UniProtKB/Swiss-Prot annotation:
Statement: the UniProt record of this protein carries the keyword Transcription regulation: no
Catalytic activity: UMP + ATP = UDP + ADP
The gene coding this protein: pyrH
Full protein name: Uridylate kinase
Phylogenetic placement of the source organism: Bacteria, Pseudomonadati, Chlorobiota, Chlorobiia, Chlorobiales
Protein keywords: Allosteric enzyme, ATP-binding, Cytoplasm, Kinase, Nucleotide-binding, Pyrimidine biosynthesis, Transferase
Enzyme class: transferase
Residues passing through the membrane, by range: none
Biological function: Catalyzes the reversible phosphorylation of UMP to UDP.
Molecular function GO labels: ATP binding; UMP kinase activity
Annotated GO biological process: 'de novo' CTP biosynthetic process; UDP biosynthetic process
PANTHER family: URIDYLATE KINASE, URIDYLATE KINASE PUMPKIN, CHLOROPLASTIC
Amino acid sequence: MLHYKRILLKLSGESLAGEDGYGINAGVLDQYAEEISEARDMGAQIALVIGGGNIFRGVSQAAANMDRVQADYMGMLATVINSLAFQDALERKGVFTRLLTAISMEQIAEPFIRRRAIRHLEKGRVVIFGAGTGNPYFTTDTAASLRAIEIEADIIVKGTRVDGIYDSDPEKNANAQFFPDISYLDVFHKKLGVMDMTAITLCSENSLPIVVMNMNEKGNLSRLLRGEKVGSLVHHEGV
């Protein structure tokens, strides 16, 4: 019995770069695709949002002298590149997928239509959402929250390279405090940087829980779906 039937998995573009620091690491891509394939085989309905920071970040130093709107559109295109790579990796494992983009790209993807996305999920396809929200000034974290609410996901899973939420970077501070369970309000007040404030607000207002977990730990996604305690859970206090 699955603890979560329909999930939205959010991955950063940087995570796809692995140790390379830039671009797409084939080994990481294959590992993540394998994790998603196993979760899909358990009967979970899985949607995916991937950032584009391994290729281009609209708020980066490289874009400092660019028009912000132009830079954000470049970032959206970067997410589509990652989405196409992920689609290929999944389909090589026999997983049926659909790529839906917020900006029309009819030669390579379907336009985002909510009912169509839900129907794909019901048919067992992994749905990848590309191009963010299609609007500048909104992050892929916000896109993930929005899409998760639209498809009525049970939870957002944010895959990272650390075990969950800490009060400081555990890769730099060995004494960082781990939060296995935390409220949306505490995420705000402690400024923990789980997601941007717009994304957290959307989740809070729609009572959509968030799990932050280590995507590099093999089997974590499957364990989470079975109801095992994995990573950090963000939810309403007392729930």
